[in-house]
């Protein structure tokens, strides 16, 4: 099953992700999108928004299996991010489509994930410049941009997690 993750999302970003999921699902009918909101107290609001888009959601329960029909897996617990980065090749980092300044991309990069982000990344500008230069992160502003990049990444047979980790560790040794 194709899996990708949206982490540290903020209000309005989950709806954006839901719409992207719907469009990607026309090509990848078994796609699973994992959403880890920045503020888990919003989980039921997010779930309702996604259901209004016609998406099937599943709230995170560690020992409960999800169905093949699940579109969006909603994580409502802190400290789970690394588990989902480990199984996702591609991660969108929230707080970047809104005027928040973005989220730290180093954890996702350390797990070898391709990173998608919006234009508002001023809190971590220098790190994103490096990641963009290495083709580890990709800036998106609109659904069409995210669809184009995710489609390319999801259709790739190459698993470049090791390559990404090596680039990060190599840069870390130089610092």
Model regions: which residues?
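Nucleotide-activated sugar donor-binding and catalytic core shared by glycosyltransferases
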Residues: 1-175
């Amino acid at each position: 099953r194709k899996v990708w993750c949206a982490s540290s999302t903020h209000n309005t970003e989950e709806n954006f992700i839901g719409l992207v999921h719907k469009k990607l699902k026309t090509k990848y009918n078994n796609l699973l999108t994992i959403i880890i909101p920045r503020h888990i107290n919003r989980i039921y609001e997010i779930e309702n928004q996604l259901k209004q888009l016609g998406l099937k959601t599943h709230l995170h329960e560690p020992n409960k299996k999800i169905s093949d029909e699940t579109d969006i897996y909603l994580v409502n617990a802190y400290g789970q991010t690394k588990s989902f980065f480990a199984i996702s090749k591609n991660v969108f980092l929230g707080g970047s489509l809104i005027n928040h300044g973005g989220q730290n991309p180093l954890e996702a990069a350390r797990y070898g994930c391709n990173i998608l982000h919006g234009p508002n990344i001023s809190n971590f500008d220098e790190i994103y410049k490096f990641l963009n230069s290495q083709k580890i992160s990709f800036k998106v502003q609109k659904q069409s941009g995210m669809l184009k990049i995710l489609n390319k990444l999801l259709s790739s047979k190459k698993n470049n997690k090791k390559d990404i980790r090596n680039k990060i560790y190599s840069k870390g040794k130089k610092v």
